[in-house]
Amino acid sequence: MYLPIFRGRQYELLALEEEVQQNLFCDISGGNQRIIPIVEPVNLTTRLTKTIESFIKQKSQIGIIFNPKSELASFDQDELFTFISAIENIHDYVIPVLYMTSDYDKTFLRLSDIGYSKADCIALCLEQPQIPILQEFYGNEPGSFRFVLVGESREFTRAIPREFGPKVICVD
């Protein structure tokens, strides 16, 4: 499984839209999706909406980071939830992605309100200070994630057990 992270700028979104229209994210033999791109929204634009709608139309999945790094995003979480909630058929094709930061619980609660469970989500635990936050989340909300993206260091593989979900090493 390959989970590339994009910053959600206009040209990246346009490229993703073209690639999904050509079915480049599916494996040729069985139609299984081997690549799930993850977008960290910078702005809430019509290009982002069109990109998500293209994935839905092609029945392909796309990950959206619901708590983007504040220095990247020029909007607040309320705007993102309103924006995403307005798109039809999001649950089958839009995978929520969460950075394991101090606000994860508020973000996850809002995701729960719109019908997502922990098993639907991908956790991003890329920095060592995020490991205890991920462990706390697992303790408060038992069950595994769809995937857990982890940093390259051995600290991640040692501290994050398999029960949390399939680990995917994130290389920058």
Q: Which positions does each model-derived feature cover?
A:
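Flexible, charged surface loops at secondary-structure boundaries
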Residues: 20-32, 55-57, 88-93, 113-118, ...
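Short acidic, S/G/P-rich loop/turn micro-motifs used as interaction or catalytic elements
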Residues: 10-11, 41-46, 68-74, 101-107, ...
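N-terminal basic/disordered segments at the start of proteins
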Residues: 1-30, 42-45
